[in-house]
Regions:
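Specific transmembrane alpha-helical segments of multi-pass solute transporters/efflux pumps
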Residues: 12, 16-17, 45-91, 125-127, ...
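Specific alpha-helical transmembrane segments that line the substrate/conduction pathway
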Residues: 31-42, 76-109, 113-115, 147, ...
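Hydrophobic/small/kink-forming positions within alpha-helical transmembrane segments
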Residues: 11-14, 18, 38, 45, ...
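Hydrophobic transmembrane alpha-helices of multi-pass small-molecule transport proteins
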Residues: 44, 110-130, 244, 253, ...
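Hydrophobic/aromatic residues within transmembrane alpha-helices
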Residues: 23, 32, 36, 77-78, ...
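Juxtamembrane helix-entry segments on the extracytoplasmic side of multipass membrane proteins
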Residues: 1-3, 25-30, 34, 53-58, ...
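Transmembrane alpha-helical segments that form core, pore/gating elements
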Residues: 18, 40-44, 98-99, 136-194, ...
Length: 299
């Protein structure tokens, strides 16, 4: 049941790209990031008030800058420059980059299965993103790599906090601080290039409002809130299984909202990437179940 619940935030996150293109196509990424982060953070804070200790503000500001301000802007750049399916499937390569980061920084070599599945995922991604078979915006691809880097560095920084700061406090305040940074950046940017901001405000439509509500309430407030709640009740491995809903949502929402279509070979490559990203967790789970059954039989 928890795995099914874990699919809910993953599904909403996967719809970000198509919903943004469909409802907010001409909006500046800085403005979108600010609107997504700050209201959601304030909602979560109102739901469960918390205040960080004085010594924790510095790390929360860094988290807000990396996890929220930079990451959200890059996500919206991807949403506005890449097909939804490509964005959703591309982001499942995070474990491969995390594996390489851990290997290079902490000298922790990956397991054989992790290495094989990672190599296969890279090969499939190389074929999917081959410019000879599909035309992709290089700005969007650079934003994807940047977003993946934010996840890895931000997760490493968050993990270093240990038990010092409650998860809810970290979540609420990194959204608020990241949203504040984005708001300031958007104000400065609007002074330099006011036309895009003026157009977004003057031409505000019900479609825009629905898109903003989806991104703020479902993608962020509900998605991140449920994410934190579930992590307290299930293992990270189990939660990873729910993550399959992310690329699937990207593919389906891109098809329904934007009319995106790909060749059978490209869809096969997407399915292969999803399978390779899940393979190590599936095998580890099966091994754990087998060990538990063996231990129970012995006792």
């Amino acid at each position: 049941m928890n795995i099914l619940l874990a699919m809910i935030p993953a599904f909403f996150w996967g719809t970000t790209y198509a919903v943004t293109q469909y409802t907010l196509a001409d909006w500046p990424p800085l403005l979108l990031g600010a609107i997504r982060a700050l209201p959601a953070g304030l909602l979560l804070l109102a739901f469960k008030p918390s205040l960080p200790k004085a010594q924790d503000w510095g790390v929360l500001v860094r988290l807000g800058f990396i996890n929220i301000a930079t990451f959200f802007v890059l996500i919206f750049v991807m949403a506005l420059t890449l097909p939804s399916a490509i964005s959703g499937v591309g982001m499942i390569s995070v474990p491969v980059f995390a594996m390489l980061y851990t290997w290079l920084r902490y000298k922790k070599r990956p397991g054989r299965l992790q290495a094989v599945s990672g190599a296969a995922l890279i090969a499939l991604a190389w074929m999917l993103f081959d410019p000879r078979s599909i035309s992709l915006n290089p700005v969007g691809l650079a934003a994807m790599l940047g977003a993946i880097s934010c996840i890895i560095v931000g997760s490493s920084l968050t993990k270093s906090l240990g038990e010092r700061i409650h998860w809810w406090t970290v979540l609420s305040w990194q959204l608020i601080l990241g949203g504040a940074i984005l708001t300031l950046a958007a104000i400065i940017h609007s002074m330099i290039q006011p036309a895009q901001y003026a157009a977004a405000i003057e031409q505000l439509s019900m479609t825009n409002v629905l898109g903003l509500l989806w991104v703020v309430l479902l993608n962020t407030a509900l998605g991140y809130g449920l994410y934190v709640w579930l992590l307290q009740r299930m293992s990270v491995v189990d939660f990873t299984f729910g993550g399959i809903a992310n690329p699937v949502a990207g593919i389906v929402s891109g098809l329904l909202l934007l009319g995106e279509s790909f060749t059978p070979v490209q869809y096969s490559l997407m399915v292969g990437m999803i399978a390779m990203s899940l393979l190590p967790q599936v095998v580890d789970s099966l091994r754990s179940q087998a060990k538990a059954q063996t231990h129970a039989q012995i006792n």
